[in-house]
């Protein structure tokens, strides 16, 4: 029995030229005389061996046609499988095929070959390949299990964990603690940061100290020259002298009532200075609570604005409700008028209906009289 070697690359079959083999027009019938001797078969075998083909003797056209059709269907099936495999590879981001996947793929291909109608020798070869594949699969699975066991044994064997050598220096921590205490003391004298953040201007402590220094300098005066308050006092004295020398001052000197009134209403510079000092001391007492009062006033102002907005909206709604009520009254009046007109129309229609009935009765009587005559 001759064997067809399917893995030989020298055999190139043109399947496109064999597509029309099922057509009745392309079929040709060849007649051949059967010889008793086997010379013809030997000549055919020799010619086929020269061409590189091994042909089975005694094979009819139907079996050849079936074999070609099966080969074509197998090729199409393999092409579809390769397309599906390519699509899977692309969907898996072109990952490399592992050894277990290769063995699985070989097993599937061998199962497909088992299904086909092949010769006994090819079936034996396929069985041998299946055995080799199963052996390789068992070897790979055993290797994986051994590796897992080794990894688990090495992992379970590690009972102790080596930590890095960390040296803690307590001197830096103590320094930080001292600095924190100093900062807390400074905050007590300077002010709380939360109160500073609550203010809108958020001025620094240095700028606030400069402002206080300027205000104190205005009140106490400068050591190098005359104080500013002294200059202010001298200017007030000059203005007082000018006022006395003016016409109004002369009138006041002449009229005692006018003088008493002006003196009672006049505020002396000493009183002004005392009032400024008292205000300064009062401001110094309430300087911590002034930002909170300012924030409270702002919140009350916002609340007042919201109340005004609500009042305006309610006022607008009230005006709209009144306009709707007026429109309702107008519509009610119009409906009453329509009701009256409908009643009048109904009365008129009834009167007209009675007149029509009377006319119909008279016409019926006249018709009966005419018929009787």
From Swiss-Prot:
Region called Disordered, residue ranges: 33-53
Q: Which gene encodes it?
A: JNM1
Q: Which organism is it from?
A: Saccharomyces cerevisiae (strain ATCC 204508 / S288c) (Baker's yeast)
Q: What is the lineage of its organism?
A: Eukaryota, Fungi, Dikarya, Ascomycota, Saccharomycotina
The compartments listed are: Cytoplasm, Cytoskeleton
Keyword field: Coiled coil, Cytoplasm, Cytoskeleton, Dynein, Microtubule, Phosphoprotein
The protein's matches in Pfam families, at most eight in alphabetical order, are given as:
Dynamitin (PF04912)
Q: Its Gene Ontology molecular function terms?
A: structural constituent of cytoskeleton
**Residue numbers carrying Phosphoserine:** 91
So what does this one do?
Answer: Component of the dynactin complex which assists cytoplasmic dynein by increasing its processivity and by regulation of its cargo binding. The dynactin complex is required for the spindle translocation late in anaphase and is involved in a cell wall synthesis checkpoint. JNM1 is associated with the rod and links it to the projecting sidearm. Required for proper nuclear migration during the mitotic cell cycle and for astral microtubule development.
Identification of the protein by name: Nuclear migration protein JNM1
Give the record's GO biological process terms: actin filament-based movement; establishment of mitotic spindle orientation; mitotic spindle organization; nuclear migration
How this chain assembles, per its entry, is: Component of the dynactin complex composed of at least ARP1, JNM1, NIP100 and ARP10. Dynactin comprises a short rod of ARP1 polymers attached to ARP10 at its pointed-end and probably associated with the capping protein at its barbed-end. The rod structure is implicated in dynein cargo binding. A sidearm formed by NIP100 projects from the ARP1 filament and is implicated in motor binding. Interacts with ARP1.
Q: Name one GO cellular component term.
A: dynactin complex
This protein's superkingdom? Eukaryota
The yes or no answer to whether the keyword Phosphoprotein is present is yes
Report the coiled-coil segments: 114-139, 200-245, 331-367
């Amino acid at each position: 029995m001759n064997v067809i070697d399917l893995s030989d690359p020298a055999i190139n079959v043109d399947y496109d030229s064999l597509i029309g083999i099922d057509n009745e027009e392309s079929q040709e019938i060849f007649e051949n005389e059967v010889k008793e001797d086997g010379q013809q078969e030997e000549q055919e075998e020799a010619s086929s061996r020269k061409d590189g083909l091994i042909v089975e003797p005694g094979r009819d056209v139907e079996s050849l046609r079936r074999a070609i059709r099966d080969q074509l269907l197998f090729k199409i099936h393999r092409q579809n499988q390769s397309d599906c495999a390519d699509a899977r590879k692309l969907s898996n981001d072109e990952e490399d095929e592992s050894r277990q996947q290769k063995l699985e793929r070989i097993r599937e291909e061998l199962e497909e070959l088992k299904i086909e109608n092949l010769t006994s020798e090819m079936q034996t070869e396929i069985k041998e390949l299946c055995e080799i594949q199963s052996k390789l699969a068992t070897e790979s699975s055993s290797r994986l299990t051994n590796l897992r066991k080794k990894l688990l044994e090495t992992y379970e064997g590690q009972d102790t964990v080596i930590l890095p050598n960390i040296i803690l220096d307590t001197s830096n921590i103590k320094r930080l603690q001292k600095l924190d205490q100093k900062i807390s003391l400074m905050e007590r004298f300077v002010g709380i940061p939360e109160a500073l953040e609550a203010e809108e201007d958020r001025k620094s402590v240095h700028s606030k100290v400069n402002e206080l220094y300027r205000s104190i300098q205005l009140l106490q005066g400068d050591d190098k020259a005359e104080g500013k308050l002294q200059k202010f006092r001298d200017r007030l004295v000059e203005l007082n002298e000018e006022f006395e020398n003016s016409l109004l001052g002369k009138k006041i000197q002449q009229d005692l009532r006018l003088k008493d009134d002006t003196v009672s209403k006049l505020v002396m510079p000493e009183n002004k200075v005392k009032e400024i000092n008292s205000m300064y001391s009062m401001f110094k007492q309430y300087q911590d609570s002034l930002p909170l009062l300012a924030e409270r006033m702002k919140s009350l102002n916002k609340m007042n604005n919201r109340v005004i907005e609500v009042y305006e909206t309610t006022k607008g709604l009230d005006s709209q409700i009144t306009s709707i009520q007026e429109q309702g009254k107008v519509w009610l009046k119009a409906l009453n008028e329509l009701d009256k007109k409908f009643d009048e129309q109904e009365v008129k229609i009834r009167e007209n209906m009675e007149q029509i009935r009377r006319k119909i009765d008279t016409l019926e009587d006249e018709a009966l009289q005419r018929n009787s005559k």
